[in-house]
């Protein structure tokens, strides 16, 4: 008697496919850099971002496992350009336009100082202009911190008026050592323009010595804040002894204090004149409160809330010199 084929060899659903045979793509974050002996102004970096992608499986229930499956990940490659300035980069050099703007800013400061000193002697006022100057010094440090926090956390290079400064400060987080390579006028000319257009009308409109005591000191600290910032990135052996002494006394922001700003989570020590306000602002969480207000009122998240990415992670000067 013949046995039918289906009866002798019954068909069964496949239920024991090993997990290793199931399709799964793994995607990780990889940073690759290529160095050569020739200068390359536009070095490309390969950035790989990690994302979770659910791959579709067959609807056949016989192919489904009752055990929970781990998230499958996919490899996606995103290419970006990264070009840290070289030590001899022309963008770090001062031009005559830069020097003229710094000279104009310093001239407006000198006029304001002269009006304060001469007006104080003529009015027999010495203490009041001095106290006003001290107030200007203290508030300049606060102002530098608020502005630094704002451009670190909000806006981008397309932001009107301050877009270039936002882009520059983001680059500064990635290559902080470049500020020590900038020439004096190159580092100060942008602030010198602001000071010139702000202080010049005040010089022409007011003669009060107390008022100018505040204006000249506040404007001086704002104009030279970027130089104080550069000194905070310098090494002690290469700084003028007077600068080191002022840093040690707390009159200028110290190297150790500002170094904390360039460490994760990158959300503290924003003030760059004397740094006197840093502890007050950080311990009272003023900036965190402002960030919450902006988020709930405007729906805007600050950059400090995100995990540090390649735009925040510092690259050393050594890797730049090898490129």
Curated annotation (Swiss-Prot):
It catalyses: a 1-acyl-2-hexadecanoyl-glycerolipid + 2 reduced [2Fe-2S]-[ferredoxin] + O2 + 2 H(+) = a 1-acyl-2-[(3E)-hexadec-3-enoyl]-glycerolipid + 2 oxidized [2Fe-2S]-[ferredoxin] + 2 H2O. A motif (Histidine box-1) lies at residues 170-173. Pfam families: Lipid_desat (PF10520). Pathway: Lipid metabolism; fatty acid metabolism. One of its GO terms (biological process) is unsaturated fatty acid biosynthetic process. GO terms for molecular function: palmitoyl-[glycerolipid] 3-(E)-desaturase activity. The chain crosses the membrane at residues 101-121, 131-151, 204-224. Keywords: Chloroplast, Fatty acid metabolism, Lipid metabolism, Membrane, Oxidoreductase, Plastid, Transit peptide, Transmembrane, Transmembrane helix. It is found in: Plastid, Chloroplast membrane. A motif (Histidine box-2) lies at residues 229-233. The keyword Cell wall biogenesis/degradation does not apply. Its EC number is 1.14.19.43. The keyword Transmembrane helix applies. Belongs to the fatty acid desaturase CarF family. This is Fatty acid desaturase 4, chloroplastic. It comes from Arabidopsis thaliana (Mouse-ear cress).
